[in-house]
């Protein structure tokens, strides 16, 4: 009998949400996603020590200023890990822009181009890279500019329908709506503590976004992210892509039985609405207390881990 991971792959592109090379070799995903937290975890893996040493040596060659060396080495380490992962996957690596730039369009564009340049210098073309940006208004504007310059983007920390709509209207390549973190918020802030998979607020959110995109003919890829259990994944089978942590990839691979398509749009494509203005975006996003909390919390957490990574690099310089 076929295992659930093999079955899921027939209807959805499976992406690995990890920086762990061993997991890549084991589960052979199409693409991979990283973020500051995953890079920090990956940096603890002994096999990656040479990548850290190389990044530090390179940073020392670029500048004699300690603060600049930290920035350079951190960027280079993220790219070095991405390069190792790209050896094992046929598709794309997602590398994230510093979360502390989430409200600065100009700085986000500059950092994205810096990361792309490092990949290009290592012989990797733009079509194998996605630049991850937080789905703030400023991050979406940065992505809009980058897309026009041939740099595809993955808009992350997406929790509200307003964020999803603004991303599609900006023509971004891919969005990563966070399923599990939405569930976390509702469990922590509501009376209901258990949800059937089809009632899971994160599943409901991604389903709504998927249907809206297909209904209006948006090309932006929907990639569900941040899963807490197998039920969420099974309920979103048919989504364009799903990025899944190694622990859940293992669970899927060890579970027998078919996975049936749950997401599909069979209606006619309708006209696109007038794009949201900045004021409309903020007003609609502000109506969702979960999205307000989780976007801010996600940016803070990624920024904290970026700081820890920089501290580790600083101590080694």
From Swiss-Prot:
GO terms for cellular component: cytosol. It catalyses: D-sedoheptulose 7-phosphate + D-glyceraldehyde 3-phosphate = D-erythrose 4-phosphate + beta-D-fructose 6-phosphate. It is found in: Cytoplasm. Keywords: Cytoplasm, Pentose shunt, Schiff base, Transferase. Disulfide bonds: none annotated. CDD domains: Transaldolase_TalAB. GO terms for biological process: carbohydrate metabolic process; pentose-phosphate shunt. Homodimer. This is Transaldolase. It comes from Yersinia enterocolitica serotype O:8 / biotype 1B (strain NCTC 13174 / 8081). The lineage of its organism: Bacteria, Pseudomonadati, Pseudomonadota, Gammaproteobacteria, Enterobacterales.
């Amino acid at each position: 009998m076929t295992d659930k991971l093999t079955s899921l792959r027939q209807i959805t592109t499976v992406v690995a949400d990890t920086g762990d090379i061993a997991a890549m070799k084991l589960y052979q995903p199409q693409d991979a996603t990283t973020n500051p937290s995953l890079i920090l975890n990956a940096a603890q893996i002994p096999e990656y020590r040479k990548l850290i040493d190389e990044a530090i040596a390179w940073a020392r060659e670029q500048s004699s200023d300690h603060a600049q060396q930290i920035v350079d080495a951190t960027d280079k380490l993220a790219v070095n890990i991405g390069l190792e992962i790209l050896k094992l996957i046929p598709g794309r690596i997602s590398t994230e822009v510093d979360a502390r730039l989430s409200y600065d369009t100009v700085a986000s564009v500059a950092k994205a181009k810096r990361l792309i340049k490092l990949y290009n210098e290592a012989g990797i073309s733009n079509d194998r890279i996605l630049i991850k940006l937080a789905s703030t208004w400023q991050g979406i504007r940065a992505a809009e500019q980058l897309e026009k310059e041939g740099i595809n983007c993955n808009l992350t920390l997406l929790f509200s329908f307003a964020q999803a709509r603004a991303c599609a209207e900006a023509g971004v390549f891919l969005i990563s709506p966070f399923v599990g973190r939405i569930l976390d918020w509702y469990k922590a802030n509501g009376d209901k503590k258990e949800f059937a998979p089809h009632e899971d607020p994160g599943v409901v959110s991604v389903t709504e976004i998927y249907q809206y995109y297909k209904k209006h003919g948006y090309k932006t890829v929907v990639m569900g992210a941040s899963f807490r259990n197998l039920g969420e994944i099974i309920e979103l089978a048919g989504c364009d892509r799903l990025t899944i942590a190694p622990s859940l990839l293992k669970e899927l691979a060890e579970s027998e039985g078919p996975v049936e398509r749950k997401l599909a749009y069979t209606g006619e494509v309708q006209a696109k609405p007038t794009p949201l203005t900045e004021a409309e975006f903020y007003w609609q996003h502000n109506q969702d207390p979960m999205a307000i909390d989780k976007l801010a919390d996600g940016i803070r957490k990624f920024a904290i881990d970026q700081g820890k990574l920089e501290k580790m690099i600083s101590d080694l310089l």
